């Protein structure tokens, strides 16, 4: 009986080592052990190589492409040369404050051309003594230009008189010019009496008493007077064929000439034909009737 039990495993009974699960597990353990041996051998070979490095005991293999290392080694001399040049260059000066601006003596202010200047008062030239004739014309004062002949403004002429005279004489010149303007206003036809320069010269040489006389007011227009050559005309910038008066001025004169200060349109036309020389030649009953 004992002999039969001892022989049973050999004949038909399977042990735990002969089971398929055990064989599969042993195969996996063998593969893991083989992988560990392979990794250890590779680590030993990499440690023996010159380019290997390790961080905290963990092996890191060298890079597969050493080209970037070559580029860094090639760039190193150029970077070293640039650093040497920067070290040789002098240190840049500290920036200047806005109040301490460095001026270049080569860029001094230049004299302006004639087209960009006007008669300015330069006290340094007025207070300085007479300069020799060899001085350039740019250093001398530019004379003031004369006004145009068409400009007959009293303010501009008074300003010219102030520039010519000085002290008490300038006041006399201004009074003379104002008196001359009043005479021109009173003259018939709106024209200046006599030539302009001759009248101004005569007014200046006539004495201060005649120039300082108060300006006389203009006489009021006479309603009944005919609008001929003796009629005073109002100065106006607009000049028509019959004179300096406008249509509104003629209508006002016609209404003021009537006793009751009321006229119809036909009566106004009749007054124009009878009083204004320009309408005398062109007026008739049909045109005056409107």
UniProtKB/Swiss-Prot annotation:
Signal peptide: none annotated. Its main location: cytoplasm. One of its GO terms (biological process) is regulation of transcription by RNA polymerase II. The keyword Transport does not apply. GO terms for molecular function: DNA-binding transcription factor activity, RNA polymerase II-specific; RNA polymerase II cis-regulatory region sequence-specific DNA binding. InterPro entries: Fork_head_dom, WH-like_DNA-bd_sf, WH_DNA-bd_sf. Residues 44-59, 75-91 have a biased composition (Low complexity). Residues 242-290 bind DNA. It comes from the Eukaryota. GO terms for cellular component: cytosol; nucleus. PROSITE patterns: FORK_HEAD_3. The modification Phosphothreonine is found at residue 117. Keywords: Cytoplasm, DNA-binding, Phosphoprotein, Transcription, Transcription regulation. Residues 1-30, 44-239 are annotated as: Disordered. It holds the Pfam family Forkhead. Gene3D superfamilies: Winged helix-like DNA-binding domain superfamily/Winged helix DNA-binding domain (1.10.10.10). Residues 142-153 have a biased composition (Acidic residues). It is found in: Cytoplasm, Cytosol. Transcription factor. This is Forkhead box protein O3B. It comes from Homo sapiens. The lineage of its organism: Eukaryota, Metazoa, Chordata, Craniata, Vertebrata.
